[in-house]
Every structure is written in C-alpha cells, then in structure tokens.
C-alpha cells in the first residue's frame, strides 16, 4: 500500500471527508430470529436473569468480572437497578424468543462518538445461552447496531489476558488481536493485563455476511448441530471480499 504524503513528505492517514461524530447508542430493542436484545430493566428482567445465573454449578463464570456471583435475587435486583440507570455502559438483556425470558446480558461501553469507537463488554451469559445460536446472534445484533445503524468505525473487545474463553470467543467472532496492555487494571485485589481486539468498519461487510450465513436455519441439522463453522464462513466471505477488491482495482 502506498502511503499518503503531506506537503512535508510525511506519511499521513487516509482522509475522512464529511466525517461527523456518531450518535450514542440508544435504549432500543434489537430483534433477531433466536433472541431479542432489550435495554436492561430490573423489574422485567432481574428475576429471570437471577434464575438463569443460578443454574451455574459454581462461580467460574464470574472470575474475570468485577462482581462475584450474587447470593440472592434481591442482591442481583439492586445491581440490575443501578446498571439499568447507566448510560455508559448501556446494558442489554438477551431474551430467548422461544422461552420468552432473559438469559444473559451484554453492554455497549466506552462510547467515543467523536472518533466512532465503541466497545462490547460486560458479557454475562448464563449456561442457558452459552455455546448456542442465541449467544452468537446476540453478539451479531449488537455489532450490526453499532456499524449499520450508528455508523461507528471501530468496535472493540477487551478482556483479562488470562481469560482464555473470552479470547477464544473474540477470535471466533472475527475480532483481530491487537496486543496486550500490561498492568492496565486492578480489580478484585489483583493485576489485570488487558488483551485488546477489534473489528473495523471495512471488515464488517464480510463478517456480516458470515454471521447471516451461520445463523440461517439451513446451516443447522435437525439435531441442532451446525453444518458449517462460523470460522469457515468468515474465511470464505473474507476471501470473496478480497477477490472483489482486487478485481475492481485491476
């Protein structure tokens, strides 16, 4: 790639003509085939969420979160009431459409509308949603909202560098690993080195195509097993996009 040079022969970034600050995310419902994302509401969601989290056999899913497992529904409800009032992070409940109940939460956080940057975080999925199409669709719906509706340029994922499941999830969802910020956070009385991942807007069309193909009913057998892994579909979509770009430039 040929660098752009300014009047002093210094390399500079690509121009962004007409760029304007993006809107902050709103408290809107996001509908999918398997799930629906609703702005967190303690009165509507706390009971279902506490029950969903109570299906965990131990507290390992909370190791890398700021909180510990809640020991009562009332304790979780108080947390949910405070979280529901927050604008950043903006928390969403994941509603299982088939069961019509909340089974997890995730949020859009660290909003930077001026630069078009936003982060998905505070992902707390119960065993009822883990490793199901619902969990993938929930991530897709929020990513599509950030890129397609709000017009953001960069979508981030950050986690404790020791949190292997989170890192694998980011990679499966198409995020690119960017590095580790050492000694970035102190939480629960211990150090956290933070692993950084991102998706940028130029990558999103291929990822969107892959998500849609993976979530399509025909990608699942009668027993619920996937026919094509998401990674395979992402590789195919990315290759097609690169080929189209090369052809247009030839």
Regions found by a protein language model. Give the residues of each.
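GNAT-family acyltransferases
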Residues: 1-132, 145, 149, 190-195, ...
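Glycine-rich acyl-CoA binding loop
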Residues: 135
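Flexible ATP-lid and adjacent glycine-rich G1/G2 motifs of the Bergerat
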Residues: 142
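Conserved GNAT acetyl-CoA-binding A-motif
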Residues: 148-158
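Conserved beta-strand-loop-alpha-helix junction that forms the acyl-donor binding cleft
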Residues: 157-167
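Conserved active-site tyrosine of GNAT-family acetyltransferases
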Residues: 169-170, 197
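Conserved catalytic-core motifs of GNAT/GCN5-like acyltransferases
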Residues: 176-190
């Amino acid at each position: 790639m040929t660098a752009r040079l300014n009047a002093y022969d210094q390399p500079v970034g690509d121009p962004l003509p007409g760029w304007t600050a993006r809107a902050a995310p709103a408290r809107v419902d996001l509908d999918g085939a398997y799930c629906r994302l609703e702005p967190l509401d303690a009165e509507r969601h706390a009971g279902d969420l506490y029950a969903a989290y109570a299906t965990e056999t131990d507290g390992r899913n909370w190791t890398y979160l700021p909180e510990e497992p809640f020991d009562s529904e009332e304790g979780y409800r108080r947390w949910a009431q405070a979280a529901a009032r927050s604008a950043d992070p903006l928390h969403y409940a994941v509603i299982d459409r088939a069961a019509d109940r909340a089974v997890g939460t995730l949020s859009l956080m660290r909003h930077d509308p001026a630069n078009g940057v936003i982060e998905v975080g505070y992902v707390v999925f119960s065993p009822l949603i883990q490793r199901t199409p619902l969990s993938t669709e929930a991530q897709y719906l929020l990513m599509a909202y950030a890129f397609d509706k709000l017009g953001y340029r960069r979508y981030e994922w950050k986690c404790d560098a020791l949190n292997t499941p989170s890192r694998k999830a980011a990679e499966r969802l198409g995020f690119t690993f960017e590095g580790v910020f050492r000694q970035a956070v102190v939480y629960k009385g211990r150090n956290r080195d933070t692993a950084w991942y991102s998706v940028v807007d130029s990558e999103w069309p291929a990822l969107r195509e892959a998500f849609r193909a993976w979530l399509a009913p025909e990608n699942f057998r009668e027993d619920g097993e996937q026919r094509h892994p998401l990674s395979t579909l992402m590789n195919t979509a990315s290759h097609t996009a690169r080929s189209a770009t090369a052809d247009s430039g030839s």
